[in-house]
A protein has these predicted regions:
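Small/polar (Gly/Ser/Thr/Ala-rich) solvent-exposed segments
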Residues: 183
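Short glycine-/small-residue-rich flexible loop motifs, especially phosphate/cofactor-binding loops
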Residues: 20, 40, 62, 107, ...
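Short, small/polar residue-rich loop motifs at catalytic or cofactor-binding pockets
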Residues: 187-189
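His/Asp/Glu-enriched, well-ordered alpha-helical/loop segment
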Residues: 99-180
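Active-site core of metal-dependent hydrolases
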Residues: 2-101, 112-118, 139-141, 155-157, ...
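Short aromatic-centered micro-motifs
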Residues: 194
Length: 202
């Protein structure tokens, strides 16, 4: 669901409401790929629980998301990873650079607005640490960034009773880092060990 000047709006408000109604009838959380525009407004009106991407979210929309206590998931690499631009034609690259400035402003505004968030990779798997670094660079506190890739992500997925933090009774899944990401978020890229279900696998 988008409806920016560049991306089509695929679902009507009535269709979104039907999705939400069916999901709630079986206690399923709803989420939408949503960059901004009318699509974002319609997702909120329909009752979608989580908005993915929000690249073009406006300040009035930030205020509404905050008031209605919805989740957002930031996936900044598609907009901020300059290495991806080399895959584009020179014409498209120029347009993407212009969009980058707009997206940075919108995401920074959402972060400043205090929205509760998770952080994801969208289609760029294996890059979660870099996504976290981008969000830190856009103004989020490192503690909030860490929550975005751990407990908040688990809450969004409805899995926070079994994972997302280190606590008795939860899955023993965690990474050991060389440094402290609260001091330097880049420490997320310096993994020295990985424990999965209580077993050292790296």
């Amino acid at each position: 669901i988008n409806a920016t000047p560049f991306i089509y709006h695929f679902l009507t408000l009535e269709e979104l409401r039907a999705v939400v109604e069916e999901a709630k009838s079986v206690n399923i959380t709803t989420a939408c790929h949503c960059s901004g525009g009318q699509g974002l407004d319609d997702c909120l009106t329909a009752g979608i629980d989580c908005l993915e991407h929000v690249y073009y979210i406006t300040q009035p929309q930030v205020e509404r998301v905050k008031k209605e206590d919805r989740w957002v998931v930031y996936t900044p690499s598609y907009a901020l990873n300059d290495q991806l631009l080399f895959k584009f034609s020179p014409h498209d690259r120029e347009g993407s650079l212009r969009e980058k400035e707009i997206i940075c402003k919108c995401l920074s505004g959402a972060i400043e607005g205090g929205l509760k968030f998770g952080i994801g990779t969208d289609g760029l798997h294996q890059g979660l640490a870099q996504e976290a670094c981008y969000i830190s660079g856009l103004g989020a506190k490192n503690r909030d960034v860490l929550a975005g890739i751990t407990i908040n992500a688990a809450r969004i997925c409805g899995a926070d009773k079994s994972t997302g933090s280190i606590a008795e009774g939860k899955a023993a899944d965690f990474a050991v880092l060389e440094g402290n990401p609260l001091d330097d978020i880049e420490a997320l890229k310096k993994v020295t060990s990985v424990i999965q279900d209580g077993t050292i696998i790296f």
